[in-house]
């Protein structure tokens, strides 16, 4: 399997995840803006990889598999960081717990959809769970919202 530009962009998105985590916890005033820049750069690779793959005829089963995995890794990690940012561990029933509940629902949905896609693929019905325009729109809104939420004034 040759390593194509779209696949390299997807792998770059995955590689940016630990960078995002490290920068998030840096005790510098610029780290909040750097987190947003890293997250936006990763989101841009999500837009670019598919567009490049389709326009250059470099689509592959591996790329089609890896792209949503990379999205889920990136979004799930960012949600966990947001829960860490907005949670107060001394108050179990504080309003901040809403962030943890929302993150759990979103991550649970992502895992469920991935499992459903895998199962449908195994039984030969993968066309029933292909990525739709609504799913792409959800990803755009989700990544935009997370990008805004990652920015914090210290």
Give each language-model segment a name.
Residues 3, 56-57:
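Membrane-helix interface residues
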Residues 23, 27-31:
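Membrane-interface transmembrane helices that cradle and orient dolichyl/undecaprenyl
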Residues 60:
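Aspartate-rich (DDxxD/NDxxD/DxxxD) Mg2+/diphosphate-binding motifs
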Residues 2-10, 14-16, 21-22, 34-40, ...:
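A feature for the membrane-embedded catalytic helix bundles of lipid/isoprenoid biosynthetic enzymes
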């Amino acid at each position: 399997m040759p390593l194509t530009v779209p696949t390299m962009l997807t792998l770059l998105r995955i590689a940016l995840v630990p960078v995002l985590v490290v920068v998030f916890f840096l005790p510098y005033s610029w780290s909040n803006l750097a987190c947003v820049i890293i997250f936006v750069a990763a989101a841009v690779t999500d837009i670019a990889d598919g567009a490049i793959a389709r326009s250059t005829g470099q689509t592959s089963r591996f790329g089609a598999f890896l792209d949503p995995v990379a999205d889920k890794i990136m979004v799930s990690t960012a949600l966990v960081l947001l829960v860490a940012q907005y949670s107060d561990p001394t108050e179990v029933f504080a309003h901040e717990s809403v962030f943890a509940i929302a993150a759990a629902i979103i991550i649970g949905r992502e895992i469920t959809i991935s499992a459903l896609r895998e199962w449908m693929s195994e039984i030969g019905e993968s066309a029933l769970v292909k990525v739709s325009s609504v799913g792409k729109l959800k990803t755009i809104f989700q990544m935009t919202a997370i990008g805004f939420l990652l920015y914090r004034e210290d």
